[in-house]
Amino acid sequence: MSSERDQEQLSLEESREGEGKSTTSQTESNASDVAEDPSTKEQTGDKEDSAAARARERKERFKALQARAKSATERNLKETAAETQRLATDPSLLSSLSRKHAFASHNLLKADTEAAGEDFERKRAWDWTVDESEKWDRRMEKKQRHRDDVAFQDYTQDARKVYKRQLREMKPDLEGYENEKMAAIEKAAASGDLEIVETNDGEMIAVDKNGTFYSTADTIGFTESKPDRAAVDKLVADLRKAEEVRLKKRRDRRGGDEDGDVTYINEKNKQFNQKLARFYNKYTTEIRDSFERGTMI
């Protein structure tokens, strides 16, 4: 029995040693395979290269951001300095100084010229041509007429001034007018009311066949015209401006007495009440005060 047990133990030990050797040999073979596999080495190298490339890219982007931040800071400082200088400089003061300098230079030149016994106006005219001098004279004459025309003369003259001012403020749309004109000509030519004829010298003229294209005293085609939104807004703005001017003149005529008692219906009635007040206020003041206090019997 003991011999059989010894044989079994020996066989178990031999089997264990064989399994250990096989495991060791398999591990060594796997390690050798891994060590000798070139694809694994390439994959590891690619990972390291990609990581380095990403690091370099991040570094370059960070440098670019730093450069942009630096340039933005410098630009902001320059703009801030320019804005500070602009705010510190008073434009009205600069224009006043330039006017004073021009006036002083004019007076100095005039004094020097008169001291030398020369004609100042003649000497100053040497700097201008005849055309420039005539244009300047016409401009000064027009300016003087405008100064003389400011005061109220009559309602016809006042209406003429308003009309001239509106003409100056009106900006005609010549391009839009030409486009509408060409569209109307093409429409009339397509309908047969207008015929385009070429002359011998190559000029194109439009012939009104039925006498309906060109307007006459009996033409009512303008009633079909519909103004655009901008023209309507401009008309509304002009009407509001005229109303504001009218109310301002009305307040100026009243002398700012808007909060006082209104005892008149128009300007003429106001003047009449003022005349009455100059003569009868000394007699009626006590009566009016009694009415206001409610003690009048």
From Swiss-Prot:
Biased composition, class Polar residues, residue ranges: 21-32, 82-92
Keywords attached to this entry: Coiled coil, mRNA processing, mRNA splicing, Nucleus, Spliceosome
Superkingdom to which the source organism belongs: Eukaryota
Keyword Signal: no
InterPro entries noted in UniProt: mRNA_splic_SYF2
Coiled-coil zones: 54-79
Location of this chain's protein in the cell: Nucleus
One Gene Ontology cellular component: catalytic step 2 spliceosome
Pfam families the UniProt entry points to: SYF2
Region of interest: Disordered: 1-92
GO biological process: mRNA processing; RNA splicing
Keyword Coiled coil: yes
Compositional bias segments (type: Basic and acidic residues): 1-20, 38-63, 71-81
Chief localization: nucleus
Family note: Belongs to the SYF2 family.
Assembly information from the UniProt record: Associated with the spliceosome.
Main function: Involved in pre-mRNA splicing.
Name of protein: Pre-mRNA-splicing factor syf2
Lineage: Eukaryota, Fungi, Dikarya, Ascomycota, Pezizomycotina
Gene that specifies this protein: syf2
